[in-house]
Amino acid sequence: MAEIALQPNLTADGNDGPAMLSTIRQLPRTVWLIGFISLVNDSSSEMLYPLIPLYLSSVLMAGPRALGIIEGVAEATASLLKLFSGVVVDRTRHSKPWIVIGYGLAAFGRPLIAFVTSWPGLLVIRFADRVGKGFRSSPRDALLAGSVGPDQRGVAFGFHRAMDNAGAVIGPLVASALLVAGT
């Protein structure tokens, strides 16, 4: 029987949990902060945006065409601005202002949904939120990559994605609990 070469920090039973936890704990504060911000941001986003179709149809009395316009404009905006912000950050090496503006647009814009009285108003708020995403995504990734050495980039990005995905799970759970409590 052939001998299996083990990866560093991987035990014979495949348990590398303690080594992985140690590696995660050693990540720089910047990576932890970006991860936490992403968790909170994604939680708030996933609390609201899955309810937009229902809000459009039952409160704003808009149809599927309005939803298509809103989401099409929003996602196209985010995609184009990611390219723009990436180019700007590569040239200037200043990522933090873009990240702050990007997350700030989301934080200030989302609560305004409560005051929207028409679907064009919702379009403006969703547009602003996606402008924020476009501004922050590439600079955030550049800051993450620059915060760790090449040997830790996979861990840093994996940790960030895990925190982001945790927010995507927490948000709908909180929204569901709030809806149940409010009925």
For each feature predicted by the language model, list its residue ranges.
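Helix-to-loop junctions at the C-terminal end of transmembrane segments
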Residues: L81-R93, L179
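Transmembrane alpha-helix termini and helix-breaking/packing motifs in multi-pass membrane transporters
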Residues: L54-V59, I170-T183
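Structural signature of the two symmetry-related core transmembrane helices
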Residues: P97-P111
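Helix-loop boundary and gating motifs at the non-cytosolic
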Residues: L21-E75
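Helix-loop junctions at membrane interfaces in 12-TM secondary transporters
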Residues: L112-I125
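Small-residue-rich transmembrane alpha-helices and their cytosolic helix-loop interfaces
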Residues: S38, E71, E75, Y103, ...
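Cytoplasmic helix-loop-helix junction between adjacent transmembrane helices
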Residues: I125-A166
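Residue-level signature of mid-helix packing/kink "hotspots" within the transmembrane helices
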Residues: E75-L83, A168-V169
